[in-house]
Amino acid sequence: AGNTCGAQGGPASQPSPTGQDVGAGNPLDLMSGNKYQQEVDLPALPGVLGLEIVRHYNSHRARRGERSALGSGWRLSYDTSLRIGSDRLEIIQADGARVIFARDPQRPQRCASTDPGRGEIRIKQAAGGEEYVWHWPQGRRLHFDAAGRLIQILAPSGEFVSLRRSPEGRLLQVTDPQGRSLHLHYHGAGSPFPGIAHIDSPLGRFSYAQAAMAHSGPGPAGRHVAKAQHATVNLTEVTYPAADARAT
């Protein structure tokens, strides 16, 4: 489950196909029990596909123990990814929503969803291997590399956002059509959490603090011990350029 409140979508996420609000409170999906939360650190800057820093929290993602560069359950709006399978492709949106595209043996270069409103994924050969392009009905295109990592967002009018990554796949830089960039900096190798420490934007630096919460489990003679190696890392504080620290 993704956004529970009739999502408006984002640069790399489609809105809810129904637009139905099933949320309550902060908000909680009454049907699935999933808690979804959106936080806007930097609203989209002016212009087509203007830079933004928007975080999405999804409790299903946190419960599954998915690793995140921000902290358990959180993703940036540019963190939509593609999971590649032998019989299907699966889009995992930044808000946690998932869209399945079945492979068609008769048309191996195209994969379709059961919902035509989700568009289709086309597969093409590129220098680094296969490249996957998610075509939205409205004309937007999302380009993923051979590992399923988002590398470009193309507007119908031709402007595009480029995403630069490390060899390991870490997002390092996001550049919008106006030439403005976000630069992502990560905690050092000696840190217990190798995730995002700062994001430098045209309006200043945003800093992110995380804290580990160790899980307990059965130890010798039935005693419970903390399992630091399985600790959940939670996002605890965000500091804005004006030194305004906000707890999440």
Enumerate the language-model features and the residues they cover.
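Short secondary-structure "cap/edge" segments that initiate or terminate local elements
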Residues: 1-116, 228, 243-248
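Extended charged/polar low-complexity repeat regions
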Residues: 53, 72, 83, 87-248
